[in-house]
Amino acid sequence: MAAVSGTRRTRAVSPTRWIVYAGSVFAGAWLATQLFYLVQIALWSFINPGSTAFMRTDAWWLSRDKPPAQVQHQWVPYDQISRNLKRALIASEDSTFATNNGYDVDAILQAWEKNKARGRIVAGGSTITQQLARNLFLSREKSYIRKGQELIITWMLETVLDKERIFEIYLNSVEWGRGVYGAEAAARYYYRIPASRLGAWQSARLAVMLPKPRWFDAHRGSAYQAQRAAVIARRMGAAELPQSQ
């Protein structure tokens, strides 16, 4: 009888062991993923990213077009991008970018209240660094799990890279339309000029597009774009650019 009871006790704890084992595997995989992100970011201190998660997804979809299309992207150094565009993006997307730690707590809380009122995720309160984290590694899916990962990657970016490098990568990787990525590709796609020659009004109009680049690509010259661009243009003079360290 004692032997039978011992066998039953062993069988009873087996599910717990499996749960512990599965949890250990999950934790190990999660830590390995975070290490992968961190190593990639460290490498980008010295080399430029070849592509982003968003670019790779778009490249796959564009390859299915008839005829097949390609992602438009050309990396250019930070000093070859118009200061007008830099100021427009900061004025539009993240006015405290040069001095914040990658997070805007007030914006996050406002987004939380807005999402709660709507009953779904419609806003994220993302800074420029958070947007970059999402573009580099994550997907367009809106979920709190993805948001949590975005916050972790944001901390990595802010810890490893200086602000000017973060902004340089952002300027060269942000989406400006279906298959259009980075300032150089956007300048040539919309205005047929290099990013270094973008004027204040052109830059303001490009900045307006970022929350919904594909929509604005399909609805160029909308009244809203012009009105919003005028607001951004007025704020550009006060936009503080990051300094290299």
UniProtKB/Swiss-Prot annotation:
SUPFAM superfamilies: Lysozyme-like
Membrane topology of this protein: Single-pass membrane protein
Subcellular location field: Cell inner membrane
GO biological process: cell wall organization; peptidoglycan biosynthetic process; regulation of cell shape
Catalytic activity: [GlcNAc-(1->4)-Mur2Ac(oyl-L-Ala-gamma-D-Glu-L-Lys-D-Ala-D-Ala)](n)-di-trans,octa-cis-undecaprenyl diphosphate + beta-D-GlcNAc-(1->4)-Mur2Ac(oyl-L-Ala-gamma-D-Glu-L-Lys-D-Ala-D-Ala)-di-trans,octa-cis-undecaprenyl diphosphate = [GlcNAc-(1->4)-Mur2Ac(oyl-L-Ala-gamma-D-Glu-L-Lys-D-Ala-D-Ala)](n+1)-di-trans,octa-cis-undecaprenyl diphosphate + di-trans,octa-cis-undecaprenyl diphosphate + H(+)
Pathway assignment: Cell wall biogenesis; peptidoglycan biosynthesis
Transmembrane segments: 20-42
Enzyme Commission number(s) of this protein: 2.4.99.28
Keyword Zinc-finger annotated: no
Keywords: Cell inner membrane, Cell membrane, Cell shape, Cell wall biogenesis/degradation, Glycosyltransferase, Membrane, Peptidoglycan synthesis, Transferase, Transmembrane, Transmembrane helix
GO cellular component, one term: peptidoglycan-based cell wall
Molecular function terms from GO: pentosyltransferase activity; peptidoglycan glycosyltransferase activity
Chief localization: membrane
NCBIfam families: mono_pep_trsgly
HAMAP family recorded: PGT_MtgA
UniProt function note: Peptidoglycan polymerase that catalyzes glycan chain elongation from lipid-linked precursors.
UniProt similarity note: Belongs to the glycosyltransferase 51 family.
Protein name: Biosynthetic peptidoglycan transglycosylase
Protein species of origin: Burkholderia ambifaria (strain MC40-6)
